[in-house]
Amino acid sequence: MAKQGSKEKKGYPELKEVIKATCKIRVGPGKETLTEGNCLWALKTIDFIFEDLKTEPWTITKMYTVWDRLKGLTPEETSKREFASLQATLACIMCSQMGMKPETVQAAKGIISMKEGLHENKEAKGEKVEQLYPNLEKHREVYPIVNLQAGGRSWKAVESVVFQQLQTVAMQHGLVSEDFERQLAYYATTWTSKDILEVLAMMPGNRAQKELIQGKLNEEAERWVRQNPPGPNVLTVDQIMGVGQTNQQASQANMDQARQICLQWVITALRSVRHMSHRPGNPMLVKQKNTESYEDFIARLLEAIDAEPVTDPIKTYLKVTLSYTNASTDCQKQMDRTLGTRVQQATVEEKMQACRDVGSEGFKMQLLAQALRPQGKAGHKGVNQKCYNCGKPGHLARQCRQGIICHHCGKRGHMQKDCRQKKQQGNNRRGPRVVPSAPPML
């Protein structure tokens, strides 16, 4: 049993870099990231569920096989939360394996849901489609909607190369930049409405900007409802946004107008938010000055947000978000110390209470005291120094006259890292044990 436990502790070396990348994905906006233990929990759980796949290497093909099998399982009522966490963690690992870098777990699930169209019914329908349309692969190299030679249309998920190119443009130039708008308008001409909105949601960018974009899309939808009363040949908002449609239905010719309207709404929203960003008085440009108190900064910020022509929920979101992101470094550190992990969701009043003393003489004296506090260096000698070897004050461990003691075997003359007894056990190069644990989400 001891040998078996030692072998399991080795983990999954072929996924070392993948797990490292997965640990950068957040459970949600502003929340904690996944841990190595979360990833190991998911992988070990999958090995227990599908024992026939346990010996196979963790390739992307195996991950898609596991993903398809998990979709066919129905968990018990008491295990639904753990099952949902298992699927979400696997989606994050799959994205990292493919080289993608989603910001949140929800974004990773969206990426996999987009790409799984390539794998649905692949074995059952692949040969038949190739026989009917031998030139299909040549025509559907890039675009999700493909015109077939025999008539009709087929759908293919957005290529990862195109998705990564859009991600790069969004990171370099900004989500609402003209460069990103041009790239999106070029590629999205043959995307379904669902493709357009999902790709936009998974792009990196300022959360406040994304909230403003969503607000502009809602305004366009409300304007469409007012100007187009329900009728037999009138498109509904759900049809335009691709709600309740399969990918095959959304790719047909009768949905061309809906896709064009959806793309135009998205471009209009991007331009509106971009114009807001460059307009004087834009809330996202209101930042706390070095000599400005947090209360004065909040007063300017709230005034700018209240002047924006957006809905109340968006105003509330901007107040909660920008009151932290646009604050000074000292105020952000103070809020982190006082409010902890919920700093992004805390109210403006709580943040003002946390920063009430920032900038005062007492706060400056506290910072000065921390900066001048001895850090245990060789130049700082005093009675408060304590030797970790003999436990007596007045000197450091390297100055101790009693000699070096090994904390592993208790003998003198060598340190723990050089202990021969430790080397004989074969554990000298192993790091701390990572305990598999379910991710705290869903």
Swiss-Prot record:
Any Gene Ontology CC annotation: viral capsid
Residue ranges of the motif PTAP/PSAP motif: 436-439
PROSITE patterns: ZF_CCHC
GO biological process: viral budding via host ESCRT complex; viral translational frameshifting
UniProt cross-references to Gene3D superfamilies, sorted A to Z: 1.10.1200.30, Human Immunodeficiency Virus Type 1 Capsid Protein, Zinc finger, CCHC-type
Cleavage, annotated site positions: F363, K364
Domain free text: Late-budding domains (L domains) are short sequence motifs essential for viral particle budding. They recruit proteins of the host ESCRT machinery (Endosomal Sorting Complex Required for Transport) or ESCRT-associated proteins. Nucleocapsid protein p14 contains one L domain: a PTAP/PSAP motif, which interacts with the UEV domain of TSG101.
Similarity remark: Belongs to the Ovine/caprine lentivirus group gag polyprotein family.
Protein name: Gag polyprotein
Naturally occurring in which organism (per UniProt): Maedi visna virus (strain 1514)
